[in-house]
């Protein structure tokens, strides 16, 4: 750790991002890292990186171009030509039948840089960023590799083109060459940075920007595989920090807080990162910095360009809560917390705190420095430890960004789908909207007379989606598409192969995929046959596209069978691209760079294709329902075909068997679990022969399908345990154990998950209930004895997602006759714990979507009242309550009872009682014991009323399953008893 004055630091890093004059030849490849369009100048700024002599060199160039947007023309068009020079496009949503008065929208294409701000704010493509438009209208794309056609001279990081003219779009192919990635041997990465602030407080309440200062700003830059570490610290009193030789952090002390913040902004310009990362910066760091600046504007500079203030855009997270997102114009800004919490692929981590994510992906943790201790250190001017803590918090996000190859992931979306780097945290529906907009406006058709492709543009009007989804209606489920202003098509003009989707004004209730009700049991040597991309295949087969919807005079909506529809062509293109990318990826035996590149691209294409069904579920549930209906029929047909192969002569002859039966013991949406029954003494190599039988069944079933439907043999399950719908686990032929829906819930303490899985493993590997119960008891005893000792406290905690707006509005039949009732404030466990954290003034206050870890303390009251945040739990001063842990154990013991039946009830009761006695021995309140009770069969089918104390609504049971499809829906129970917890009588 070295201490500098700020002027010394500026001098030391003056040349860090200024390589002086250098040449970029026609052989030097560069990558567009960031694009920024200035509407006032009508100019595109391209920020680029190139690798020369194993160093990253940064530069930018300008391109003169006009960017276009679209607005609706409201002229009455009484004359042959429109004074606004509008173009008539076919509507993307419900255009009608080709050749029978297609519905049109008149659109004016105009130059954004010459338009009034009000026009740009109200344009039809307002959901796009300017860089999305650049990607659609020019060859410049973020993440693309390029070369200059002629050698260019770079001065002060600027490449100006020739002496006679600046770069412009009309001369693109004279000035630039697009580079095929297949010809590259290594990638060009952006320069990364991350910042983090530490704030002061009175030690009792959370920091407030109006009162509490910023103690320090950590800032780390990652360039050329090296880190440059900075810490800007503020203290109103003169303070000395001891220097150390084992840490190369550059520390600068300030006695004026605004000077410190300004110096931080200045250091961003000096070090010139391409990407600025933070963690929860949109919610905490940036608003706090702005609050401390008071009336001073936050301005970011880059090169010799005019300083620009960040812009904000409202972001709605998956819980429906609204948060501002900050964009940095010349820089890429990514709030990694928002990225992880909004990415559906990150469901494996326990929560989205930096420590948890870093531990999971990097095996590294933050420095353990309690916030109250940090404030004490600051007050006594011991700032060196705070600096180390602050800088470490900046290192971890950069390491995560590199480890997860996030740059290639982001750029793949830009190149493939016309997204931009500012779309990195946008939801999947935005991705599909951008892809559909571009596909519609550039749509082509084959001219039957010439055989050539010619333009056939449609216009994607996002306002139509709001109408058909019912967004503008009080009752969102009804009359959506009937509110579209469309000419109705006569019934006689509806094609005969069109599908009737029902009345346009129908009430829509979503119905998911088919799920069979299984019998809880253990199965040996079952195998799974799954459909390959079932919903994608259905959408292509039925031509599911919003441009195929037809509103008919008979009041119904029809789905036209037009295979040239925009989304159908998009799906076929995506599937083709994925096959190509996977093939290219698998051919990369020598280049790790190309392998990763193609892997990111195939993942991006897969994610987009798989999201289109969900897109219909958001905006037009009628079409989504029809897709799932076809899926249910295909699953029924598959089950019939599989079971119809029982005692098939060809199979008997091929495998020398006297008899064989196939029974589908479970099915879910697109998969089947099949149990083959035959005399195993008739086969030689059990595993190999079973795999051959599975492959043969796959071939026979697929030979009966048409329209591209295919099933694939996925797993041979040596032992399969099915508990209920969507809850099972198995040991596959590679000796790997897989859990699906069972023992995976995040609200269950880690130690219980470990104990349960270890116990279940004894069944899967040894088929031994006694080993299972011995393992379970030993694990629970160990974790009880080591509580607050060798085992981390996080292993014992529960967690619940915090949401500002919990629950749904429920109305009774009598509510219509009464006035509005006062809104009742719902106190969930998460809200209760958050309020405690706020009142205690902790360093991290969870926001919407955060999972809050908590324990129960042994006091009198309901679960909510007992809940206490783990961050503040002190095992020396507080006594834990185990009652919720034992409730989860009770559920698990009942699950084992369902699987094994009544004959094992005594063994289960003995184990359960021993564990309960251990955990209840020092507890004062809610002391309970397990009791076996007879199940009242009449009440088996009655849905359990929600317990007031059951505040965790994170159940993942039966989500989206087709509960109304009663085929094979009667559960056959193995047990007539169940465990209940009763209070111990004093």
Curated annotation (Swiss-Prot):
Return the EC number: 2.7.7.7
Q: What class of enzyme is it?
A: transferase
Keywords, sorted A to Z: DNA replication, DNA-binding, DNA-directed DNA polymerase, Early protein, Nucleotidyltransferase, Transferase, Viral DNA replication
Which SMART domains has this protein been placed in? POLBc
Task: Name the segments for region: Disordered.
Answer: 804-824, 944-969
What PROSITE patterns does the annotation carry?
A: DNA_POLYMERASE_B
Database matches in InterPro entries: DNA-dir_DNA_pol_B, DNA-dir_DNA_pol_B_CS, DNA-dir_DNA_pol_B_exonuc, DNA-dir_DNA_pol_B_multi_dom, DNA/RNA_pol_sf, DNA_pol_B_thumb, DNA_pol_palm_dom_sf, DNA_pol_type-B
Q: Where is the composition biased (Acidic residues)?
A: 948-968
A biological-process GO annotation? DNA-templated DNA replication
Alphabetized GO MF terms: DNA binding; DNA-directed DNA polymerase activity; nucleotide binding
Catalysed reaction, written as an equation:
DNA(n) + a 2'-deoxyribonucleoside 5'-triphosphate = DNA(n+1) + diphosphate
What is its biological role? Replicates the viral genome, host DNA polymerases cannot substitute for the viral enzyme in this process.
The record's family statement is: Belongs to the DNA polymerase type-B family.
Name it. Answer: DNA polymerase
Record organism = Bombyx mori nuclear polyhedrosis virus
Upper lineage ranks?
Viruses, Viruses incertae sedis, Naldaviricetes, Lefavirales, Baculoviridae
Gene expressing this chain: POL
């Amino acid at each position: 750790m070295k201490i500098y004055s700020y002027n010394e630091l500026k001098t030391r890093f003056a040349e860090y991002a200024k390589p002086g004059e250098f040449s970029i030849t026609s052989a030097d490849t560069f990558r567009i890292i960031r694009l920024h369009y200035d509407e006032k100048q009508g100019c595109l700024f391209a920020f680029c990186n190139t690798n020369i002599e194993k160093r990253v060199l940064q530069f930018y160039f300008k391109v003169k171009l006009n960017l276009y947007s679209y607005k609706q023309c409201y002229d009455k068009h009484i004359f042959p030509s429109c004074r606004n020079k509008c173009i008539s496009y076919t509507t993307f949503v419900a255009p009608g039948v080709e050749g029978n008065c297609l519905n049109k929208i008149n659109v004016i294409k105009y130059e954004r840089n010459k338009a009034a701000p009000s026009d740009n704010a109200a344009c039809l493509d307002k959901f796009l960023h300017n860089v999305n438009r650049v990607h659609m209208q020019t060859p410049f794309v973020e993440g693309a590799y390029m070369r200059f056609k002629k050698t260019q001279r770079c001065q002060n990081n600027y490449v100006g083109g020739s002496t006679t003219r600046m770069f412009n779009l009309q001369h693109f192919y004279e000035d630039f060459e697009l580079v095929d990635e297949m010809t590259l041997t290594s990638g060009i990465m952006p320069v990364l940075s991350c910042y983090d602030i530490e704030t002061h407080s009175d030690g009792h309440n959370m920091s407030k920007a109006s009162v509490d200062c910023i103690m320090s700003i950590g800032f780390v830059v990652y360039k050329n595989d090296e880190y440059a570490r900075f810490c800007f610290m503020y203290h109103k009193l003169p303070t000395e920090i001891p220097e150390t030789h084992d840490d190369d952090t550059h520390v600068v002390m300030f006695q004026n807080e605004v000077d410190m913040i300004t110096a931080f902004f200045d250091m961003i310009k000096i070090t010139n990162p391409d990407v600025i990362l933070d963690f929860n910066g949109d919610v905490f760091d940036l608003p706090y910095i702005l609050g401390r600046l008071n009336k001073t504007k936050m301005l970011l500079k880059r090169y010799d360009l005019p300083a620009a203030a960040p812009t904000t855009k409202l972001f709605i997270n998956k819980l429906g809560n609204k948060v501002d997102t900050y964009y940095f114009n010349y820089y890429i800004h990514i709030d990694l917390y928002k990225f992880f919490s909004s990415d559906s692929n990150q469901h494996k981590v326990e929560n989205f705190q930096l420590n948890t994510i870093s531990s999971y992906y990097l095996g590294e943790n933050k420095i353990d420095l309690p916030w109250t201790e940090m404030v004490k250190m600051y007050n006594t001017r011991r700032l060196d430890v705070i600096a180390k803590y602050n800088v470490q918090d900046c290192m971890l996000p950069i390491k995560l960004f590199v480890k997860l190859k996030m740059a290639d992931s982001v750029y793949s979306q830009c190149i493939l789908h016309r997204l931009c780097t500012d779309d990195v945290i946008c939801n999947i529906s935005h991705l599909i909207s951008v892809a559909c907009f571009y596909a519609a406006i550039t749509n082509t058709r084959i001219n039957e007379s010439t055989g050539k492709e010619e333009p056939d543009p449609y216009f994607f009007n996002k306002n139509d989606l709001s109408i058909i989804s019912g967004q503008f209606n009080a009752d969102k489920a009804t009359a959506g598409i009937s509110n579209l202003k469309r000419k109705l098509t006569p019934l006689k003009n509806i094609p005969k192969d069109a599908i009737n989707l029902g009345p346009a004004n129908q009430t829509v209730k979503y119905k998911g995929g088919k799920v069979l009700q299984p019998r809880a049991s253990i199965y040996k040597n079952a195998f799974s046959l799954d459909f390959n991309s079932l919903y994608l295949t259905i959408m292509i087969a039925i031509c599911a596209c919003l441009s195929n919807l037809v509103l008919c005079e008979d009041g119904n909506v029809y789905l036209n069978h037009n295979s040239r529809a925009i989304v159908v062509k998009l799906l076929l293109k995506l599937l083709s691209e994925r096959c190509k990318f996977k093939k290219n990826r698998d051919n990369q035996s020598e280049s790790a760079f190309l392998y990763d590149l193609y892997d990111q691209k195939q993942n991006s294409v897969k994610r987009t294709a798989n999201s289109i069904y969900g897109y219909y579920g958001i905006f037009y549930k009628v079409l989504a329902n029809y897709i799932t209906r076809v899926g249910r029929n295909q699953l029924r047909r598959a089950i019939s075909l599989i079971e119809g192969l029982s005692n098939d002569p060809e199979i008997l002859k091929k495998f020398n068997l006297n008899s064989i039966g196939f029974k589908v013991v479970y099915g879910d949406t697109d998969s089947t679990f099949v149990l083959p029954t035959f005399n195993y003494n008739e086969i030689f190599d059990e595993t190999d022969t079973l795999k051959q039988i599975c492959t043969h069944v796959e071939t026979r079933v697929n030979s009966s399908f048409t329209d591209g439907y295919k099933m694939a043999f996925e797993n041979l399950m040596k032992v399969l345990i099915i508990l209920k719908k969507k809850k099972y686990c198995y040991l596959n032929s590679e000796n790997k154990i897989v859990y699906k829906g069972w023992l995976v819930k995040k609200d269950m303490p880690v130690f219980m998950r470990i104990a349960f899985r270890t116990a279940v493993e004894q069944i899967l590997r040894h088929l031994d209930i006694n080993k299972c119960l011995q393992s379970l008891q030993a694990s629970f005893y160990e974790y009880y004895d080591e509580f607050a000792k060798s085992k981390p406290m996080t292993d014992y905690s529960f967690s619940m997602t915090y949401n500002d707006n919990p629950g749904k509005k429920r109305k009774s039949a009598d509510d219509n006759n009464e006035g509005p009732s006062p809104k009742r404030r719902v106190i969930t466990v998460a809200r209760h714990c958050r309020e405690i954290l706020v009142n205690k003034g902790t360093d991290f206050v969870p926001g919407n979507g955060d999972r809050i870890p908590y324990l129960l303390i042994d006091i009198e009251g309901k679960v909510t009242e007992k809940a206490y945040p783990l961050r503040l739990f002190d095992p020396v001063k507080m006594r834990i309550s185990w009652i919720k842990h034992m409730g989860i154990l009770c559920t698990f013991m009942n699950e084992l009872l369902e699987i094994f039946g009544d004959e094992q009830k005594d063994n289960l009761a003995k184990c359960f009682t021993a564990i309960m006695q251990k955990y209840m021995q020092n507890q004062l309140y809610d002391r309970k014991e397990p009791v076996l009770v007879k199940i009242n069969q009449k009440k088996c089918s009655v849905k359990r009323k929600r317990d007031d104390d059951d505040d965790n609504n994170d159940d993942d049971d039966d989500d989206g399953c087709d509960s109304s499809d009663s085929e094979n829906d009667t559960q056959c129970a193995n047990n007539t008893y169940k465990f209940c917890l009763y209070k111990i009588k004093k």
